[in-house]
A protein has these predicted regions:
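N-terminal Rossmann-like FAD-binding beta1-loop-alpha1 element of flavoenzymes
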Residues: 6-33
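Glycine-rich FAD pyrophosphate-binding loop
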Residues: 26-46
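Active-site substrate-recognition segment that forms the wall
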Residues: 47-50, 55, 59-99, 228-236, ...
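Rossmann-like flavin
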Residues: 90-212
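C-terminal catalytic lobe of FAD-dependent flavoproteins
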Residues: 165, 297, 338-417
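A conserved short coil-to-beta-strand element within the FAD-binding core of flavoproteins
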Residues: 172-180, 222-236
Length: 417
């Protein structure tokens, strides 16, 4: 029997699931949010803290032979792989490479940008409601360069994105960059200052604030087993620590763990993960980092957080549950110390998260093709935080029958058969 206090069960209390639950609760639905752990404790805890309005091109697989050769030696910071995982990952990587061909990548960017263009405004709306606007900083972020060749290439790209997608930026020479970041070593030749994005100085704090807003509206958060989701007549049932739960509609927003629920229902999405690591540091002396910053040629990211300076790494291609191997963090730390005066580590061990990725670089958002009253919201890769609020609104509109504010067709789960 359906729980009279539950219209919708949302599986997954990362930033995407929380935003889905909050948007549905705002629309008068009785929602229960379910996770095996606490809210925003996995990938949504440790990201780089960017809401990337400039991120109109999803992260593609390189086609440049030189880059492929460098990655093949497995010695870079921005990409690392487990050799033992390559056989399992090969079908995904092949499809990812094909979708990343320049012409195809440009097509996907046009589709992807329709979500990205709303990312800041949708988060602003939820943050205002949740009393969480203080987590959001409007400084933009810096993409910094060590060589004139890379700088000039990316400057031209930024100008194209301005013309095609309306993404604004400032192109900085070394002198201006040194003025706005005086504690960064003078080894850089310029930067792109992306001015439209915003950053978050405590990603988990933002997610928990959204959760509190959801609960103030009457929503419930419980712990439960996503693998127990099953059809119950015309609705759904599952097990939670508080007992059986039934609902008319279910949303799977489990990020890299989506297959825990989807495979049992007969869906085999071509998902893989890009794992990533972070570590916090105290800034040495009176040093201050004013902007989040990507060291482009080296492949790591520094961001000022409430806890300290967060160093995040690039993509690790591995099986989701494989042993942690923070190799990239070890490679990045001495280079980051040379760029900015980092003092001691503030975490006892590196944090690791997993980014859920599809080979065509678009998230999976929409109704399940073979089940009624089942919706999917996962596969956001590097942009779970960026697209969390957008996805929450879009899923809520699809469930309630409102006209969707973004055409959902490109992100349909049905595209994978």
């Amino acid at each position: 029997m359906q729980d009279p206090a539950c219209d919708v069960v949302v599986l997954g209390a990362g930033i995407v699931g929380i935003c889905v639950a909050l948007h549905l609760q705002k629309r008068g639905r009785a929602v229960v949010l379910v996770d095996r752990r606490g809210a925003a404790e996995e990938t949504s805890f440790g990201n780089a803290g960017l809401i990337q309005r400039e991120g109109v091109y999803p992260y593609g697989f390189p086609h440049d032979f030189g880059a492929l050769l460098r990655y093949g030696f497995n010695r870079t910071i921005d990409a690392y792989y487990h050799p033992s995982a390559l056989l399992r990952l090969a079908p995904f990587l092949w499809k990812y490479w094909r979708h990343s061909r320049p012409a195809r990548h440009a097509e996907q960017a046009k589709r992807y940008s329709k979500l990205i263009e709303h990312c800041v405004s949708e988060h602003d709306a939820l943050a205002a409601q949740a009393g969480a606007s203080g987590f959001i900083r409007r400084t933009g972020w810096l993409k910094v360069f060590r060589t004139a060749r890379e700088r000039d290439k990316r400057f031209a790209e930024a100008e194209r994105w301005r013309e095609e997608f309306g993404v604004r930026s400032r192109l900085l020479d070394a002198g201006v960059l040194q003025e706005i970041e005086p504690h960064v070593a003078p080894v850089l030749v310029g930067a792109i200052h992306w001015t439209d994005p915003v950053s978050v100085d405590d990603p988990q704090g933002l997610g928990l604030s959204y959760l509190c807003a959801f609960e103030r509206l009457g929503g419930r958060f419980v712990q439960g087993n996503a693998a127990s989701l099953a059809i119950d007549g015309s609705g759904w049932r599952m097990r939670t620590v508080q007992g059986p739960l039934a609902a008319s509609t279910a949303v799977i927003a489990l990020g890299p763990w989506a297959d825990v629920a989807t495979r049992a229902l007969g869906y085999d999405f071509p998902l893989a993960v890009k794992r990533g690591y972070h570590m916090h540091y105290r800034a040495a002396g009176e040093a201050r980092l004013n902007f989040p910053m990507l060291d482009t040629e080296r492949g790591y990211f520094l961001a000022p957080m409430r806890r300290g300076i967060r160093l995040t790494t690039g993509a690790e291609f591995a099986l989701r549950d494989a042993i942690r191997t923070p190799v990239q963090l070890g490679r990045a730390e001495p280079i980051a110390r040379d760029l900015f005066p980092l003092a001691e580590r503030l975490d006892t061990e590196p944090w690791m998260g997993a980014r859920p990725c599809t080979p065509d670089m678009l998230p999976v958002i929409g109704p399940a093709p073979r089940h009624k009253n089942l919706f999917f919201a996962f596969g956001h890769a590097h942009h779970g935080l960026t697209l969390g609020a957008v996805t929450g609104r879009l899923i809520a509109e699809l469930i309630t029958g409102e006209p969707p504010f973004v055409d959902p067709a490109p992100y349909s789960p049905g595209r994978f058969g």
